[in-house]
Regions:
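Short acidic-glycine-tyrosine-enriched beta hairpin
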Residues: 13, 52-70
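Residue-level marker of beta-strand positions
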Residues: 26, 45, 63-64
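Short, conserved beta-strand element in jelly-roll/cupin
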Residues: 31-47
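Conserved hydrophobic/aromatic beta-strand scaffold that supports enzyme active sites
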Residues: 7, 16-20, 64-66, 85-87
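Conserved short histidine dyad/triad with adjacent acidic residue
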Residues: 15-32, 49-51, 68-69
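Ligand-binding loop in jelly-roll beta-barrel domains
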Residues: 69-91
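Local beta-strand/beta-hairpin segments that build beta-sheet-rich folds
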Residues: 2-9
Length: 92
C-alpha cells in the first residue's frame, strides 16, 4: 500500500486527514461512517474501486468535492506522480 497519512484535526465535529499516495499506491478497502469533503492538494488521476466497479477521476488542485457516507471503496493513485489530498470528515 505505500500510503502516508497525517491526521491534522480530530475532534467531536471534524476529522481532517492528509493522504499522500505514491504512484500505484492505494488506501485499502474502507467505508466512511460520515459524509466528507475531499480537497486535492495536487493535480492527478484517481482510480476508485467501488460497488464492484472501476471508476476514474481527474483531480484538480484546490477543487473540492463531496462524498456521502457509507460507500465501501478503495482509492488508488492512477498517475505517475505523488497524489496528495486532504479529507475532511463531517462527524455527526
Amino acid at each position: 500500500m505505500l500510503e502516508e497519512t497525517d491526521r491534522q484535526v480530530d475532534n467531536a465535529r471534524t476529522r481532517v486527514t492528509r493522504h499522500r499516495l505514491a504512484p500505484g499506491a492505494h488506501t485499502g478497502m474502507h467505508r466512511h461512517e460520515d459524509d466528507y469533503v475531499v480537497v486535492p492538494v495536487t493535480d492527478g488521476r484517481m482510480r476508485i474501486l467501488e460497488a464492484g466497479k472501476e471508476l476514474f477521476a481527474d483531480l484538480e488542485s484546490g477543487v473540492a468535492y463531496f462524498r456521502p457516507a457509507g460507500v465501501e471503496h478503495d482509492v488508488f493513485n492512477g498517475g505517475d506522480r505523488e497524489l496528495v489530498f486532504v479529507e475532511v470528515e463531517l462527524l455527526r
